[in-house]
Design a protein with these regions (language model features):
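Cytoplasmic (intracellular) domains, linkers, and terminal tails of multi-pass ion channels
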Residues: 2-8, 26
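Regulatory nucleotide-sensing modules
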Residues: 11-65
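Cyclic nucleotide-binding regulatory domains
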Residues: 41-110
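A small-molecule sensor/coupling module
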Residues: 95, 102-104, 120-159
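Conserved active-site beta-strand element of glycosyltransferases/polysaccharide synthases
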Residues: 116
């Protein structure tokens, strides 16, 4: 049952949407479904990241703590992940390359949610065995990062 949910979720994920069934198979096999209640934290800013996540059901806010000039902190919503046609990936991208990664924001469930999680170390091993998949994923990452940079620049221009 979980493999069906995982496959359907990964098909909706920006990062994996273009993979064939055969290419997606090793990723489905290592992925897991995690369930959270409203208010649960999936991962926290400043902590070491080890997984990538894709929202299956529910809603998750990405929150960033920001240090203010008076020494206090504020929390800002960076992005809200919803059950859309094309889903964003969240978590620790750099560990796919074997690099340590500290989470740059926190992921908090706004309502009961299910996510598909993948340990980055397992993903890296799967990619190392299948260089063609790795190439497709890294090409997709470049396009996703380009879009996010464009979005960030557009947001800065409104300040």
């Amino acid at each position: 049952m979980d493999s069906k949910v995982i496959r359907e979720t990964l098909r909706k994920c920006q990062l994996f949407a273009g993979l064939s069934d055969e290419e997606l198979k090793p990723i489905v096999e290592l992925a897991r479904v995690e369930e959270y209640k409203a208010g649960d934290i999936i991962y926290e800013q400043g902590h070491f990241g080890t997984k990538l996540y894709c929202l299956s059901k529910g809603q998750v806010s990405l929150l960033r703590r920001i240090g203010l000039s008076d020494g206090t902190t504020a929390t800002s919503t960076v992005y809200i992940l919803r059950e859309t046609r094309l889903r964003r990936i969240m978590g620790c991208w750099c560990t796919l390359l074997g690099e340590d990664h500290i989470q740059m924001c926190s992921a908090k469930c706004d309502k009961p949610s299910k996510v598909v999680s993948m340990a980055c170390s397992d993903l890296k091993k799967a990619f190392d065995k299948n260089p063609g998949i790795q190439t497709k994923i890294l090409e997709k990452f470049i396009l996703i990062l380009r879009d996010r940079l464009e979005s960030s620049y557009a947001a800065l221009e409104t300040l």
